[in-house]
Amino acid sequence: MPSSAQVLLCLAAVLAAAAATTAEAHSQCLDNPPDRSIHGRQLAEAGEVVHDLPGGLRAYVSGAASSSRAVVLASDVFGYEAPLLRQIVDKVAKAGYFVVVPDFLKGDYLDDKKNFTEWLEAHSPVKAAEDAKPLFAALKKEGKSVAVGGYCWGGKLSVEVGKTSDVKAVCLSHPYSVTADDMKEVKWPIEILGAQNDTTTPPKEVYRFVHVLRERHEVPFRRQDRRDGPRLHGQLVQQAPQLNEACTAPTRLNSINHSSAVIFCFDSWLPRLIFMATTSSTTVISLIFFVSMYFFSFLFAFL
C-alpha cells in the first residue's frame, strides 16, 4: 500500500500535468480576437472577395491584377476576414502590389470554444503550404514576381513556402510554430517582425533565427522588434483600432508602421520587371520612339 508521501507526490504530479495542459490549451494566438461585426463597407475596403482560385481557394484580393509584383498573405488563426488585416492588405496593394489573402482555413476559424491542439491537427500550415502550390504556380505563370507573408499560423505557412522556388521573398509577423531549423531551409530573403512580449515566439527565439541565418551567409535577412513595434503576439491584425475604443493610440501607430515595414520588405527584395504591366501605354510608346530614333541614327552613321 502506498505511503502518504507517495500519494502526495502522485497528486502533485497530476496537478502539475493538469496545469501544463491548461497552459498549453491557452495560447496568445487566441488573445484579442477581431471584431467580426465590423463590415467591409465601414472600413472602406478597396478589395473584393473572389472564388474558385487555383487550388479551390477563395480569397480577399486588392490592387491591380496587372501588377508584375504579387504578394500572398496568410492570415492568423482568426482567418482572412479580420478587419485590420484587410486594411493592411489595402495599404500594401496601394504601394503597387497585387495582394491575395486566401482563406486557407476554409471558414473554420479558431475561437476559445475549440480545442487548440485538435484544431491545429485539422489545419496544418505545412499542408496548407502544399495545397497552395497551384495558386503560386498560377501567379508565376502570369509573369509576376511573387512574395509571401504571414501572421501567427500564417507565418509557419509562409516559411514553408519560403523553402521552395515558388516565391522570391518572405515576411513573417509574430509567427507561430516557426523554429530555428526552419531558417536552415529558407531559400529567399526573409524579414522577421517580432513582438516584445510574445510568448509564442519570444525575442530569444527570434535571436536563434537570426543566428542561423547569419551563419548561413547566403540568405539576406532583417529582424525588426523595435520598442515602438508590437508588444503582443497578434497585436497587428487582431484588432480594428479606428473602431475599437479599447484600442490605444500606440496600436494605431503599430498598424501603420507595420504596413510600411511589410512594404519596405517587399520593395527591398521582390524583383521589379523592366516592363511593368502597370506601365501606361504613353510611356511604352515614348520608349519605343526613342529606341527607334537611336537605332536609325546609329544605322545612318554607317551609310
Swiss-Prot record:
Plays a role in control of plant growth. Mediates specific degradation of cell wall (1,3)(1,4)-beta-D-glucans and is related to auxin-mediated growth and development of cereal coleoptiles. One of its GO terms (cellular component) is extracellular region. It is found in: Secreted. Glycosylated. Keywords: Glycoprotein, Hydrolase, Secreted, Signal. The lineage of its organism: Eukaryota, Viridiplantae, Streptophyta, Embryophyta, Tracheophyta. This is Endo-1,3;1,4-beta-D-glucanase. It is an enzyme of class 3 (hydrolase). GO terms for molecular function: hydrolase activity. Disulfide bonds: none annotated. Glycans are attached at N115, N197, N257. It comes from the Eukaryota.
